[in-house]
Amino acid sequence: DIIFGMSNDIKQDLGTVLQGKCEPIDAVTQVKVASNLNILCAPKNPFTVVTAEQIADICQQVKKYFDYIIIDTGAGINSHVFDIVEQSNLILVVTTPDPICVRDAQMMSDEFYKRGNQRQRLIINKVSKRTITNKIIRDLDEIIDTIGVQLIGVIPEDQELFIATGKGFPLPYEAPSLIAFDAIARRIKGEDVPLTIKIN
């Protein structure tokens, strides 16, 4: 809700749904700057326990209203995340070029493969020439080979994105990251989009 500038507009969230105070669809809020995007916010109480079964039930109830349902698990590795993500048709493994993040992504992907989930795609986020120039990584192929997941997109480090998410504003059309997001979305939809990588 914060990155969409809607933190003061959310009346119901996942916690409200789990408490039985409202139906899942009633807790869904339309994003102001994108008429085709809706969000169901995480519980305000960080200690709220959400099970994979509850997520599956909520998705089942609301799927007739939407073309796609995106489950954002946040960073970190735990069994809870694996159980929830197993409800998905496609897993997007997101990492930055940082070696620690790459290692975590590799561990997560390996666990998904062990559980029989082959439908994974890799997104490399916050990529800049600096990460390669400073030899933090040799190249993007090194990350792809380490994690072992097919690449679906690279998002360049973008000051416009940093400002937009901090203020809850939409990205300007010329923002490099917006171009990358659009290409990723089209690939998810099944379009044949060339994988072009523009790094600032």
Residue ranges and their predicted role:
Residues 1-64, 159-171:
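P-loop/Walker-type NTP enzyme "switch/lid" segment
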Residues 9, 44-46, 76, 98-100, ...:
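Conserved nucleotide-binding/hydrolysis micro-motifs of P-loop NTPases
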Residues 38, 67, 89, 120, ...:
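Conserved acidic residues
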Residues 40, 63-80:
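Glycine-rich phosphate-binding loop used to anchor ATP phosphates in small-molecule kinases
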Residues 41-42, 93-96, 123-125:
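Conserved beta-strand segments of the P-loop GTPase G domain that flank and frequently precede/overlap
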Residues 78-99:
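Inter-motif core of Ras-like GTPase G domains
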Residues 103-117:
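Conserved C-terminal guanine-recognition region of P-loop GTPase G domains, centered on the G4
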Residues 114-200:
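C-terminal lobe/tail of nucleotide-utilizing enzymes
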